Curated annotation (Swiss-Prot):
Subcellular localization: Cytoplasm
Protein family membership: Belongs to the TACO1 family.
Major location (coarse): cytoplasm
Keyword Transmembrane helix: no
Chain intervals for the UniProt region annotation (Disordered): 1-20
One MF annotation (Gene Ontology) recorded for this entry: DNA binding
UniProt-recorded name of the protein: Probable transcriptional regulatory protein CKO_01097
A Gene Ontology term for the protein's cellular component: cytosol
Gene Ontology biological-process entries: regulation of DNA-templated transcription
Key words, A-Z: Cytoplasm, DNA-binding, Transcription, Transcription regulation
Lineage: Bacteria, Pseudomonadati, Pseudomonadota, Gammaproteobacteria, Enterobacterales
Amino acid sequence: MAGHSKWANTRHRKAAQDAKRGKIFTKIIRELVTAAKLGGGDPDANPRLRAAVDKALSNNMTRDTLNRAIARGVGGDDDANMETIIYEGYGPGGTAVMVECLSDNRNRTVAEVRHAFSKCGGNLGTDGSVAYLFSKKGVISFEQGDEDTIMEAALEAGAEDVVTFDDGAIDVYTAWEEMGKVRDALEAAGLKADNAEVSMIPSTKADMDAETAPKLMRLIDMLEDCDDVQEVYHNGEISDEVAATL
């Protein structure tokens, strides 16, 4: 949506996401286990694990649950025998789409992802077909806040950029490995974020109209319903006017 942060866009779809909360928790736990398996159980020394912990807490997962998942990864749980796979493709209206998966069966995963693209008027691309349009960043989001205060604290903590949106939301962008450190510094300054996550930020946007926007939303929903899909990133831009018709 034009003039809104990624977090605001996420909240726009919150009702649908709440219905998927069980599946979301399962995916977060899988990422916690895998991150701990690959990089150790200390979030301060393992940026991927720290990002997973931040995401778990942003989704109201209890400390007990996430600590058990980390312990499973450190202990070599079978769920840790997963590999990260990134699929790239084109969605409705020529949108660039990246699909991050954790899978123990590439054939199963690619079949599910390809099916979602084909059902929604898109197509799966080759490696590198759209990746050049995205940059991996940490995104720390505030629904409201004083821009000058947040900007000063964020830049002092090592953030790369601070963006204010039309609805008053503020996003702080960081190198993805530094997101946890910057978030800690902001909290130490009395600035508690509403969300923190590692994301793929597009360098260009594709405007969605009343015809293509519903198709893009359907593609995102179908992909997120796949058990192996962890995250879906895209460069579709949906205006407030079009969003009101969805």
